[in-house]
UniProtKB/Swiss-Prot annotation:
This is UPF0056 membrane protein MJ1677. It holds the Pfam family MarC. It is a multi-pass membrane protein. It comes from Methanocaldococcus jannaschii (strain ATCC 43067 / DSM 2661 / JAL-1 / JCM 10045 / NBRC 100440) (Methanococcus jannaschii). The chain crosses the membrane at residues 7-27, 49-69, 70-90, 112-132, 145-165, 185-205. Keywords: Cell membrane, Membrane, Transmembrane, Transmembrane helix. Its main location: membrane. It is found in: Cell membrane. Belongs to the UPF0056 (MarC) family.
């Protein structure tokens, strides 16, 4: 098992999940709920997101093989996708991931937790891609376990953040959330560029 690989996988997945950026949307959707129901929404959101990300992480390689897509091609495409998302984060435009119609259509706890919170806010194209690439690049079973651990840790932190969403917003404010989002976007930009470089190098060699 490679600790450096775990750090890379965790950084990529956690940055794209960006739990702090999810706080304003979570508060908007659950503002009329009592604390107990808000906590239930947070729990179900993370469970749904975990199921989606694990499914693509574990079976993503077979999906690529089924469609005849090489890992290097997927790295390039995935890197470009992550780069576009990260640039939106740096420019403070990540909220475009959630459309107003999706927010207005979400009424019940299960509906809110699944859509738009679990997907596309948390388990969206970017985080799914990050998980699939991290798992596909794992050199052995130990590294694959580290990717799963990175997913669990990232969503664990996300769960704790959503549980204390109002406190987080009060403490760091919307400006603080924007700053954190931009910082995570910068980290993700570097990871995305490296992913593209690795994909091109692998395709040419």
């Amino acid at each position: 098992m490679d600790l450096q690989y775990f750090i890379l996988a965790f950084s990529s997945i956690f940055s794209i999940l960006n739990p702090f950026g999810a706080v304003p949307v979570f508060i908007t959707l659950t503002e009329s709920y009592p604390k107990k129901e808000r906590d239930l929404v947070a729990k179900k959101t993370v469970i749904y997101a975990l199921a989606i990300l694990l499914a693509f992480a574990l079976f993503g390689e077979w999906i690529l093989k089924f469609f005849g897509i090489s890992l290097d091609a997927f790295k390039i495409a995935g890197g470009i996708l992550l780069l576009l998302i990260s640039l939106d984060m740096v420019r403070g435009q990540q909220e475009a991931k959630i459309h107003r119609k999706e927010i207005e259509a979400a009424y019940e706890i299960d509906e809110i937790a699944l859509m738009p919170l679990a997907t596309p806010l948390l388990a969206g194209p970017g985080s799914i891609t990050a998980c699939m690439v991290a798992m596909a690049e794992a050199s052995d079973i130990g590294d694959k376990f580290l990717v799963i651990l990175a997913i669990l840790l990232s969503l664990g932190i996300t769960y704790l953040t959503l549980l204390s969403a109002e406190s987080v917003l009060d403490r760091i404010g919307r400006l603080g959330i924007r700053i954190l989002t931009r910082m995570m976007g910068l980290i993700l930009t570097a990871i995305a560029v490296q992913m593209i470089v690795n994909g091109i190098r692998g395709a040419l060699l």
